[in-house]
Amino acid sequence: MNATPAIVMPSTDEEIWRYSRIAERFDDQQQRLDGLRRFFSFSNEITPREFDGYARPLLQRTLAYAWAPRVEAAQRADFEQRTSAWLGQGYVIRDQDAQGNWQPAPLRDHYFPVLYTQSADQPALPYGLDLAGQGARQATLARALEPGSMAVSEPLQIMDAEAGRPAAQAGGLLMVAPVFAERGPDNAPSGYVMALLSMRQLIAALYEDIIKPRLAGVPASARCWSGK
């Protein structure tokens, strides 16, 4: 038994308009993230307060924003020490496994740890999380290496950083954009800004704008579901 809704492409002007609204919402996310990228690109140094002040107004329809600078292996100890003093709390570049357990990141040539993060509520992107050590996230970074580029991850499970279990917003997409304020080795990005998007919110928008209007006035017994 296959109980998936039949997918029908837009065929009327009204349906095309509704699909365009979904595209516009995604374009809006890209524009907001690009604004955050430019904020970093044209600033010499950004404080946690400045990041929070810029990112917080952008949080509508976005779970979190974050900044992850590139840290070379030789810089790690000094970076962790300075960041702990700067943030006023212990800071370690770290990895999280599939069960939500944390451990210090092993030696790597370089790291992209979350340094600043801003969210309206949990889940946020945890401080110190090394994107270079997270398979799907690292693959996303690898697709955004050129100035002006962006990449979106495959659907990810979002972990509650404090509880060590899947968060209420269990599914999400990570949109990343490279920053080239200072060219790294081999012209690599100096860091990434990122937005964490809720799959639940995206699906809700799809339902409200596309599916619900199609079902309006259609008897339940006549609604289009494939069943073989």
Give the residues covered by each predicted segment:
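Membrane-proximal amphipathic alpha-helices
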Residues: 4-33, 40-48
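Intrinsically disordered, low-complexity polar/acidic regions
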Residues: 11-16, 41-228
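Generic detector of short, locally flexible boundary/turn motifs and exposed helical patches
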Residues: 30-35, 116-118
